[in-house]
Amino acid sequence: MSNSIVHDVTLQVELTNGNDGRGNKWFSSAKIRKSMESLLFGHSRTPWDFPTRVVVTRILGPGQRLWDSSSILRGNWKEIEDALVCLGWWHDDGPKWIEKTEGEQDASQRDNGPAVRVQVYRTES
């Protein structure tokens, strides 16, 4: 599999881990997605016409601790991803366009955090 980076951006959005729970109310996540879409409005683009792999890096802010690795993508990343789909990054968030999403953390840039870095790679089998 060949991977070449096609987009690399740091968004001034705090990645949450979802420890506060979501319950079974869909409108809560819809509200978060709309809020993220408004925050990220300047990042609109034309969708990629090829499959991608996404690396999401949580950039820690001052005083924040590293999470368990399984917590990185379980919080508000889904709403951020949905907002980016609405802003034209992908046609949709299905496996045809996003084959894989990986989560990482970076404690070396605390002056820039909290933030989330999104790296999009073109994937070809």
Task: Label each residue range with its predicted role.
Residues 1-125:
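Catalytic phosphate/metal-binding cores of nucleic-acid and nucleotide-processing enzymes, i.e., regions
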